Structure formats: structure tokens, C-alpha cells
Curated annotation (Swiss-Prot):
Protein's gene: HMA3
Cytoplasmic topology ranges: 1-89, 135-141, 185-310, 360-542
Family: Belongs to the cation transport ATPase (P-type) (TC 3.A.3) family. Type IB subfamily.
Keywords: Membrane, Transmembrane, Transmembrane helix
Bridged cysteine pairs (disulfide): none
UniProt xrefs under NCBIfam families: ATPase-IB_hvy, ATPase_P-type
Domain of life: Eukaryota
Protein name: Putative inactive cadmium/zinc-transporting ATPase HMA3
Spans traversing the lipid bilayer: 90-111, 115-134, 142-162, 164-184, 311-333, 342-359
Topology class, membrane: Multi-pass membrane protein
InterPro entries, sorted: ATPase_P-typ_cyto_dom_N, ATPase_P-typ_P_site, ATPase_P-typ_TM_dom_sf, ATPase_P-typ_transduc_dom_A_sf, Cation_Transport_ATPase_IB, HAD_sf, HMA_dom, HMA_dom_sf
GO biological processes: detoxification of cadmium ion
Amino acid sequence: MAEGEESKKMNLQTSYFDVVGICCSSEVSIVGNVLRQVDGVKEFSVIVPSRTVIVVHDTFLISPLQIVKALNQARLEASVRPYGETSLKSQWPSPFAIVSGVLLVLSFFKYFYSPLEWLAIVAVVAGVFPILAKAVASVTRFRLDINALTLIAVIATLCMQDFTEAATIVFLFSVADWLESSAAHKASIVMSSLMSLAPRKAVIADTGLEVDVDEVGINTVVSVKAGESIPIDGVVVDGSCDVDEKTLTGESFPVSKQRESTVMAATINLNGYIKVKTTALARDCVVAKMTKLVEEAQKSQTKTQRFIDKCSRYYTPAVVVSAACFAVIPVLLKVQDLSHWFHLALVVLVSGCPCGLILSTPVATFCALTKAATSGFLIKTGDCLETLAKIKIVAFDKTGTITKAEFMVSDFRSLSPSINLHKLLYWVSSIECKSSHPMAAALIDYARSVSVEPKPDIVENFQNFPGEGVYGRIDGQDIYIGNKRIAQRAGCLTDNVPDIEATMKRGKTIGYIYMGAKLTGSFNLLDGCRYGVAQALKELKS
């Protein structure tokens, strides 16, 4: 009982942090050491390529800003990531890098005015502070990272009085760090776009109050208007509509929803008004589970990555020993041109940093997983990517993978001798201009492609019938457009629809046009193949 009461008092929240100080997997243990000492942190995970730390914490005990403070005490440069941030903000280099670069360029004019040579030293001082701070933090944790190795190289270069070269090392390292941070930021945007699929607010049907989805419990009835995203998984208890489920299923054709129909968060109500009784909490919805799967896949390590991480423990000391040998052995052997050997030692020290080796595999894996996620593919782990090299048979889902998941009109015909094709297409496209259905967009585009310009202003009494079609009065005619069920609403008593369907090819969606109770036209919609699919399948077979 005591344990149950304690869990009720907790208010767990998942927060996302951008941690610029994570340059490779060796910093994961540093993050772990910091967060394990923080009271209120229940669990955490680190995604190295995007420099993301995900923390589940009790907000009664610790806030996201306090977690940031704890991480920054270890010089990890952490910040709270706004929920669902999807806009790519332009990131400028740090002021240290900019000032260092300007002074370095000015120092190159020393050949015209020799005192400008000293600007190189000022460039080192201006740009070395971030490197120095991170290097000190690394050494105090008994670790040698790229910042410590670079700082040693800069100090040694200054001792050799190669001021311009020292400034160049500082500037190039700062620029490289900025480019890496920008790449990590772009990667994190992908994860944020998945998080933002579902809305963060829901409207309670009984009161009309708008609340956070995290506050909505199970069996709560929420209302969803036309054009809005469904906030939480549930069952329709009132109303009807067509729902676009393309974000989750990849299927381009909207699904009709009636009473007792199941709906999912992040899908879009295209028309109609519905009330939904929730069947899950926001954190347990399908879209939340999908995001969780992607996070787990990004955190998982491939066999190659685990092997590289294991080797990297011994790689850094080996680099330092190798650099020391290049510097010390020539001195012991009393060889000439010692400055050349010192220079080689510095090259080994800087270029031999393990960060590039450690990051190579996880970055490639991360890019593959995130690109797949945004394209509609969920890959369980990084090991699955390595397994792809050994597969013999591939099975593809058609919609959204082989096809574009967008409708296009493949056939449009008039079934009445008294109504020509252009006249019928003019009526249909004008009425469909008032509809938000994906089928409407395809018909409008088709009309314009054959030089028929729709005029929605002349359409009267437009009505939408979810799961059936639409109605509009134009030029004195009552026009019904939709699927087979629209016939009954149009007053058609003869069952001539199956005869038309028998002439259609499989894989096409069939639409019907009624003028009053008379069937006057039909059209076919299909989901066209993606560009390059045939070539891709041919290459896979080869």
C-alpha cells in the first residue's frame, strides 16, 4: 500500500535535452555518472549521433532546468529541447570561433606588415577557451578526449613558436565542432517531427475545455472537429467522418469512421464532427509507441559499433604513446631536425583522436534509422541494418512504399449521351473544390490538366456525407459524387454498379457520378508508382 501511495505522488515526465558536449560514446558514462546522482531521475538514455539525452524524472523532485544545471556542471553544454520542434534554425559558429577566424586571417598579412604576426597568438587566446574548459573537465574525470589532445597540440605548437599553425588548429577545431553540432541538430529535428505528429491539446466534449493530452484519462470523451488531428487513441461514440491515416498506415485512401469505429492519435479528421472515448493514455498511444520504437532503435548498438567501442578504450592511450614516441625517440637517438619529428608527433596527436572512429558507425546507423522513420519505415535495431547485407528475399508493402500514396485519375468517362465529358468534369471538379477529401484534389488536378477550370462559387447547397461522398447543385442539376453507397442517397433504385465494377481493373478505386437518380459518369483513381521504383527493384534483383 505504501508503495502504491508513493507512486501516486510521483509526477513522471519525459524530457528531451540537447547536449552539445557529447561528441562520442565515451561521454555516455559521464552523462550516466551525473544523472545517477540526481534525486528524482528514474531512467535516462543517450542518443550519441543527435547529442540527445532523454530523461524520465519526477517533476515534484526535479525540473528540466535543474537537470540542465547538473549536466552543465560537468561542462556538457546541455539545454532543454522544446517539445516537437521541427523548424531547422540557422546555427552560427560560436563568437570564439568567429573572432579567432578573423584574427587568423589578419595574421596572414604579416608578410606585408610583420607585427601582424602576433595576431595569431591573440587568435589562439580568443578561440581556445571552449577547448580549454572541456579539456579541464575531461582531465578532472581522468579521461583524455579530443579537447585534451587538441589543447596539448596547441601548447606544443606555441612552444615551437609556430603561432599561425597553433591559431589554425584552434580555428579549424572550432569550425569542425560547429559543423558536427549542426549535423546533430538536423538529426534531432527528425526525432522531434515524430514527436509532434500527435497534437498536445484535446477538447473535452462535455465542457468544451481545452486541456493537455497528458491530463486526459481513459474513458474520457473528447471532441474532434473537421480538419483537426485526433489527439488520443479511442472509439467513436457519436458522429461520423473520413479519417486520413496515412501518417501511421501509409494508406492514401481515407477510412470511413462510424459509431464504434476505432481511431488513432495523429490521424486527421477530414470531415464531420465526432466524439471519441479514449482507450489509452497519451503516452500509450500508437504514435507514442512508434516514437519509442525509433528511440530504442537509435539507442541500440550494432555488433560493429560494440566492437569499435571496445577497441576505443585502448585506442586513445595508444595514440598518446605513439605521439610521445615520435617526439622522444628522435631526441634519445640524437637525430637531426628535431622540429620535424615534433611536428609529426603533433599530427599524430590531433588526427589520431578516436572520436572519428567511434562516431563513424553510430552516425551511419542513426542516419539510416531516422531517414527510414521519416519515409514510413520502422527498423527495430541497428543490427537489422547489418542483416540486410545477407538477405535473399524481400517483401514490400505496396502503398506508400512502391507507390506515392497519392491519388491520380486514371480514367474519367461520361455514361450519358446527352452530357459531354468536359461538361461533366466541370460539374464534378467545381463541387469537389468544396471538399477536403484527397479524392477531390485528384479530380480537380485532372480537370485542370485537360483545361477545365472549376468554379466553386456557382455550387449551391454543398453537402458532405462521410463514408459516402458529396452533393452539390450546379447549373440547376443535383449532382452526387462518391462510392457505391452514394447511389441510395441519390435515389437510384437500379443496381447497375456491379456491371461497371466488372470492367474495372484491380487496384483501382472506383467513383460514381449521379445526376439526380441517374448514373451519368464514373472515374477510376489509382495510386501511382514512385519514380525510380522499377529501377530500384531491378537493381535489387541483380
